């Protein structure tokens, strides 16, 4: 059986403050708290910011979380609602794993 995950990619939105790093952006603490709910519910496997200067990051849900649930959760993110971040959900086929 194929392991398909619906990965959330974040990038700076229209309310992103130029010259500020990710953790200085408005709403990022609430963004982290939002995804911590999924981590605590064991629905999030990995997540974090990109380390380049472009900002943004990604979240990798555990196997079995539907595209609809991932899309809904991503749209409820306070940083997405405020425009600090944009979220894109993309399907990802795990081709290699331990």
PLM segments and residue spans:
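Conserved, structured core segments of small domains
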Residues: 1-98
């Amino acid at each position: 059986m194929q392991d398909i995950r619906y990965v959330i990619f974040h990038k700076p939105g229209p309310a992103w403050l130029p010259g500020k790093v990710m953790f200085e952006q408005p709403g990022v603490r609430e963004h982290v708290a939002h995804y911590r709910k999924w981590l605590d519910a064991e629905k999030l496997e990995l997540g974090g910011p990109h380390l380049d200067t472009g900002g943004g990051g990604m979240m990798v849900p555990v196997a079995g979380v539907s595209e609809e649930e991932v899309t809904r959760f991503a749209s409820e993110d306070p940083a997405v609602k405020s425009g600090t971040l944009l979220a894109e959900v993309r399907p990802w086929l795990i081709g290699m794993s331990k």
